[in-house]
Curated annotation (Swiss-Prot):
Pfam families: V-set. GO terms for biological process: adaptive immune response; immune response. GO terms for cellular component: immunoglobulin complex. Residues 24-34 are annotated as: Complementarity-determining-1. Gene3D superfamilies: Immunoglobulins. CDD domains: IgV_L_kappa (cd04980). Residues 57-88 are annotated as: Framework-3. Residues 98-108 are annotated as: Framework-4. Disulfide bonds join C23-C88. Residues 89-97 are annotated as: Complementarity-determining-3. It comes from Mus musculus (Mouse). Keywords: Adaptive immunity, Disulfide bond, Immunity, Immunoglobulin. PANTHER family: IMMUNOGLOBULIN LIGHT CHAIN. This is Ig kappa chain V-V region HP 124E1.
Length: 108
C-alpha cells in the first residue's frame, strides 16, 4: 500500500493568515492527490482533487499544488470557518490511503 505522511499533526494560525499543509507519499502518485476537510462536528468535505482542482462550491482561498511524492494545501486569508482537520488522500491505487491529518487551530 502507498503510505501518506502529514508530518505536522497540528498547526496554529491567526485569522487572515496564509497557511500551508504538507503531505508526502511513499511513491510517485502522479498527481492523484485529494484533500478533505473534517469539521469539529465530524462533517467531511472534499476540497481539492487531482492535486489542484477545486471541488464545486469550495472557496477560492483554498488551493493545492505539488507533484511526484510531495503535495501541499494552501489556505489564503484564513477564516474562522476553516478551523478543521485536513487530510490528504492518494487516489492512484487501491486502497486509497489517507494521511494522518493536520488539525488547524486559531492562535489566540
Amino acid at each position: 500500500d502507498i503510505q501518506m505522511t502529514q508530518t505536522t499533526s497540528s498547526l496554529s494560525a491567526s485569522l487572515g493568515d496564509r497557511v500551508t499543509i504538507s503531505c508526502r507519499a511513499s511513491q510517485d502518485i502522479n498527481n492523484y492527490l485529494n484533500w478533505y476537510q473534517q469539521k469539529p462536528d465530524g462533517t467531511v468535505k472534499l476540497l481539492i482533487y487531482y492535486t489542484s482542482r477545486l471541488h464545486s462550491g469550495v472557496p477560492s482561498r483554498f488551493s493545492g499544488s505539488g507533484s511526484g511524492t510531495d503535495y501541499s494545501l494552501t489556505i489564503s486569508n484564513l477564516e474562522q470557518e476553516d478551523i478543521a482537520t485536513y487530510f490528504c488522500q492518494q487516489g492512484k491505487t487501491l486502497p486509497r490511503t489517507f494521511g494522518g491529518g493536520t488539525k488547524l487551530e486559531i492562535k489566540r
